[in-house]
A protein has these predicted regions:
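Post-DEXD/H (motif II) to motif III coupling segment of the RecA-like Helicase ATP-binding lobe
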Residues: 34-45, 52-108
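Walker B catalytic acidic pair
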Residues: 20, 49-51
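Loop/turn-to-beta-strand initiation segments
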Residues: 12-15, 21, 42-45, 72-78, ...
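Inter-Walker segment of RecA-like/P-loop motor cores
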Residues: 1-28
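SF2 helicase motor core recognition
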Residues: 26, 206-207, 211-225, 241-249
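C-terminal helicase lobe and adjacent C-terminal extensions/tails of nucleic-acid helicase motors
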Residues: 70, 133-143, 147-149, 154-189, ...
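Interdomain hinge/linker at the junction between the two RecA-like core domains of SF2 helicases
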Residues: 82-140
Length: 455
């Protein structure tokens, strides 16, 4: 019996550290595993870090769940963030206690913790990748270490390549690293470890320079501190998170955060970021960039952000015209359909729990996990491909293999499969061929030439 697994499934221990995804699945996802945890929430204290990252479509579900836990399960809820979204001011609000703020004067607190200066260098029509690369390299020459955060994986790769090309042409010795979710967790940890080591040694070796180009993943509680941070324009909450990686430990009086915009940026698949960017762009026309982290401006941003969301968007819209929020509340569509078929339900509960649970996903999971040949992942691929492998051990070994897995979208899996880059081990684990995993970028979805010649 795996005691650790049982505790993980049931939450039968005093202190639990989990993710927002796992918590929301416990409340709303179908299946029995999540339900085993629900009873453990009674008489508990729930602390949500970075609550502004709550997916927009889960907003009303989250508010209703928090109100239920507070009123019926005697739960105390603490929402932590530097950018508090106005969840208590929506049509279906979260019910805050009186004097809910744990800090008495947020304006005074903001002024006391103002560690960065924000500059808006966006230009009409946006800048090219080469222009941003030149800007970053020039900044590294003057200020030292530079972090650049972009919205898209493609942008991170292109910008990394442009910076490398610029440095090669100018024969400058600056270390450049890349971070994105196309790298497995073990790979990202190794890169972050080297980044922290270089940042820690900058006092001893001030002539050294580091440029880190990353997607938003570095904003998720990663403890790094750069004197200069460039952020591709997005919502103010994202900008605030980026600013949290600048002068984080107060090494200087004020660090520098510069906002820029790419030309022809396609955010059509990232609705929340696209909406946030539009509102941020509008506000930047009417406010000084250096004031956007103030409580007043942040409140204005969130008010506009939720104003443009439709009521349906906040209720978790489904492929049909229904929403999960409606299925779990009045379920009027279900009742109407029952009436039309002469099947009036005799139950007091008319909620469509099964349909709601089947449809609920915190993050669109149109992805497939692939085991990649990075470090220990190579040995795991060999292990899973061994015909003598004990299939009873697959659950335990797969948990260990998570450090070497990359989630790929369906179109990426299709493209890699067409290139012959993916194959299944004897244990049925989808694996990536070695030439399609790059030490700088991670998974390569374009055709790669094999460096080995078979004669």
């Amino acid at each position: 019996m795996d005691v650790r697994r049982i505790l993980t499934e049931r939450w039968d221990v005093p202190v639990i550290f989990t993710t927002q995804v796992q918590f929301l699945n416990t409340l709303f996802a179908g299946g029995n595993t999540a339900l085993r945890r629900l009873h453990a929430l009674e008489d508990s204290i729930l602390i949500f870090d970075e609550i502004q990252t709550l997916p927009v479509r889960c907003t009303y579900l989250f508010n209703a769940a928090m109100n239920f836990l507070k009123d019926f399960c005697r739960v105390t809820i603490v929402l932590c963030t530097a950018t508090q979204p106005p969840l208590a001011q929506l049509e279906f609000p979260i019910e805050m206690s009186e004097n809910a703020d744990l800090t008495s004067d947020t304006t005074e607190l903001f002024e006391g913790f103002q560690r960065v200066q924000i500059e808006n260098i966006c230009k009409d029509g946006g800048a090219s990748v080469d222009e941003i690369a030149d800007e970053i390299v020039s900044s590294a020459e003057v200020h030292g270490n530079v972090l650049c955060i972009v919205n898209l994986t493609k942008q991170a790769r292109e910008l990394y390549a442009a910076v490398i090309e610029h440095l090669c042409e100018s024969e400058q010795d600056i270390h450049v690293v890349h971070l994105s979710t196309k790298m497995c967790p073990a790979h990202r940890k190794e890169v972050l470890k080297s980044v922290r080591t270089e940042l820690a040694g900058c006092g001893q070796y001030p002539e050294q320079r580091l440029i880190c180009i990353s997607t938003q993943l570095i904003e998720a509680g990663v403890d790094v501190s750069f004197p200069v941070v460039y952020r591709a324009l997005a919502g103010f909450s994202s900008i605030a998170q980026a600013a949290g990686r600048c002068n984080r430990h107060g090494e200087m009086e004020r660090g520098l955060v510069r906002l820029f915009s790419f030309e022809n940026e396609d955010l059509s698949r990232l609705e929340d970021i696209w909406q946030g960017k539009k509102i941020a762009l509008d506000l930047l026309y009417h406010a000084e960039a250096d004031t956007i982290l103030s409580p007043h401006t942040m409140e204005d941003y969130f008010r506009r952000f939720y104003r443009v969301q439709t009521a349906r968007t906040l209720r978790y819209p489904m492929a049909s015209q229904n929403t999960i929020f409606d299925l779990l509340s009045s379920n009027e569509a279900g009742l109407q359909q029952a009436h039309e078929h002469g099947d009036d339900p005799a139950l007091w509960f008319t909620h469509a729990f099964r349909d709601a649970g089947s449809a609920f996903e915190v993050i669109d999971s149109y992805t497939e996990s692939v085991l990649v040949p990075y470090a220990g992942g190579k040995e795991m691929i060999v292990e899973f491909n061994d015909k003598q492998f004990d299939k009873k051990m697959i659950g335990r070994r797969m948990r260990a293999a998570q450090q070497y897995m990359v989630s790929l979208f369906s179109y990426e899996v299709k493209r890699l499969s067409a290139l012959g880059a993916l194959w299944q081990t004897e244990s049925g684990i989808l694996s990536l061929r070695e030439e399609y995993y790059d030490e700088a970028f991670g998974v390569q979805v374009n055709e790669q030439r094999n460096t080995c010649c078979m004669i």
